[in-house]
Amino acid sequence: TSNVYEEGSVQHIARIHVSLGVDQSSKKEYEAFTTLYSENIALIRNEIIQVIREQTYSMMSKADAQTKLGSEIVNRLNKLLDTELIKEVYFKDFFVQ
């Protein structure tokens, strides 16, 4: 859950729950990633919240919002963790009001 703003300082709420789709084709890389993920869960959560806070209500209300937001989260988390194993973001909950 995060605050989302619109021009004119109108405050909105975004409640979003995500799961990550990770490339599991290499068992060794996947196991290393799961360790990296566990060690950096706070940073990962913070990065996802930051991506959401950078969005406006108008951006989050568009039909392609989940696709664009998912791509941005994938890019930012892969950069944060110095990996390319995160391939997809799955939205369990996507509520903007």
Where are these regions (language model features)?
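Amphipathic, interface-forming alpha-helical segments with heptad-repeat character
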Residues: Y5-S61, S71
